[in-house]
Amino acid sequence: MINTKLLFVLTRFCCENSSSCIQVSMVLFLIKNTLLYLGCCSSKSRTAAIVGAAFSGVTMATASLTGLFHVPVISYASTSRLLSDRSRFQYFYRTVPSDNLQAQAITSLLHEFRWHFVIVLASDNEYGRSGVTALKQTIQNYTTRVQICVVVDELFSRKGSQYEMTRIFRKIQQFPRAKVIILYAEFPDAVYFFKEAKMASLRNYVFIATDSWVGSTEVVQGSSDIFQAIIGLRPPIVSMPKFDDYFLKTLKENNSRNPWASECNKSLICSDKSVERCQSEVHHDGYVAYILDAVFSVAHALHAMLSCDEKVCAKKWRDVDIRDLSQFIQNVSFVGYSQENIFFNEEGTTKGRYDVYYLDKESSKYIKVGSWSQTALSLNLSRISQPGPDFPFPASICSNYCRKGTSVLFVFTVLRLSLLSGQVKAYSRRALRAI
């Protein structure tokens, strides 16, 4: 058991804005000067660690700054593989797997469904660029007889021009046999993409959703004609009944200082008398368990660093070197709220696995249909109830597969220049290649 009095948590919200998060980080370091001015603490008051952020770009900016002060950053959702670079982010850790692992999972799905002719679109930011790079490297290195061909590979931004989106959609339409789109986008960019795709009259594609937007029906609201199916990957969602009970209790208290209660009342039209309506509608984000894992990683590290038992600590925070905390975080090992064994590798990342989800059009809900780990992909497609000629998913190949016992005949022409006569002669050659 760890000493539960170790942590004082100061919460700040900076959304996806890197500049705002840098300002918040600076405020954390300036708090010490404010407390000193008020005369309520010693000069040894210091920020121990920062939990967050969610967006990879924001986390990179924050970790770059706080690393100068030897303050660890533990993210619960940032997956960019760039954050694994210890020469840049020496004090960074995360409780979710990196894009490298997600790329392996996506590639496994492509081969499982024999999708060998695909389109890759990504946010033009750290999350998208990093993810696509990892995916293309994984596809290239994947050992298989049939290679995956990426026919469209484009970055987009919701702050970009309309011309760029039009160009991308026209390029997609040049490959009618490519029916699978891997959308490696952060949530706001995914919302933007589907709105633009609807205006461009994109129809009946299969989308592979990455962990940033899978699970959200808001992304595809009003865009059901664009996709035939959506299948996606995300770290496992863990049931948190104690957290749900605490959240509901907080709503019932109707604390005017609680911004979350206020927002819930606005969105669900709740009041003191009808707050029970929130019980069935409000649910915690799937990353809550990973946030708690990040917080407890710091707690376990401080517990060991300060030589604590359940009641007291042998050492004082003011007497230890803050630079040592990172190494204690590196060495933690415990069973987390995510039901995973939490420990960090040399890149500051935990091991990971993914659940596979499918968006059921009839119910507008995501259904878990499988799981992926580094050892195996397991699918249960019987849970998908969507009849049709392409059940469960359409083909996405450059040509039709041959019948059993036949092979593809490739015919190509070779131009040969005769140096003596100066004439160009055409020779037809044939090559047989089995599928």
What is the meaning of each model-derived region?
Residues 1, 18, 23, 31-57, ...:
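Extracellular ectodomain signature
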Residues 6-18, 316:
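Acidic helix-start/capping segments at beta-turn-to-alpha-helix junctions
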Residues 8, 13, 29, 410-412:
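Aromatic (phenylalanine/tyrosine) cluster motif
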Residues 59-78:
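Short beta-strand-centered segments that line the small-molecule binding cleft or hinge
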Residues 77-91:
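Flexible loop/hinge segments that line or gate small-molecule binding clefts
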Residues 90-96, 276:
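Short, conserved non-catalytic motifs in the polymerase core
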